[in-house]
Each structure stands twice: as structure tokens, then as C-alpha cells.
Amino acid sequence: MLEKYGRVYAAVDLSAVVENMERMKEALSPQTKMIGVIKADGYGHGAVPVGRELEKLPYVSGYATATAEEALILRRAGLKKPVLILGYTFPVSYTHLTLPTIL
């Protein structure tokens, strides 16, 4: 018989996220703009905490999400940089996307 176990827990070191972005920036030309892809709840690590760290980085010019709902979560959390929605946006979401800088 299988034993019951709890859900998997993953702790994200936000300083490691920033370090990864720093390393990528070092490999690019100075005029290259970067965008933080924060979809699927930051790939399961929490879109808002990851986004808040990326918000502090001047070379990150915005974010990308998979859905309109994810974009709205970032905006409602107070993130100010532009958000690009990568996936299909259903017409029902159009009225919610009149917030500035959601593309």
C-alpha cells in the first residue's frame, strides 16, 4: 500500500533570480533590453515575489505573462512596468485590459 505524503514544497531564493538576471545582462550588449517572463505563477515560484524583485532592476523593461489573468495579478500587486501577454486573450478580458501598460 502506498503511503500518503504532502505536496512538494519549493523555496525560491529571490537573490538567485536576481543573480541569474545579472549574469544574463553581463552577456548582452549594454543597449539590449530584457523582459522578465513570469508565467504559470513564476513557474510555480510565485509571480508576485519574482516580479517585485525584477521591478527593482533598471535593465528589466517589463514582464511577459501567458494570460491576461496573470497580467492583472501583477498589475494589482503594484508592479508598474509594461506587461506583454504571450497567449491568446479572450474577448471577455478586453475591458479589464484597459489598464495602462498591459499590451
Language model segments and positions:
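Conserved, mostly hydrophobic/aromatic
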Residues: V17, K39, L74
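Glycine-rich loop at the start of a catalytic domain that most often binds anionic cofactors/ligands
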Residues: Y43-V60, R75-K81
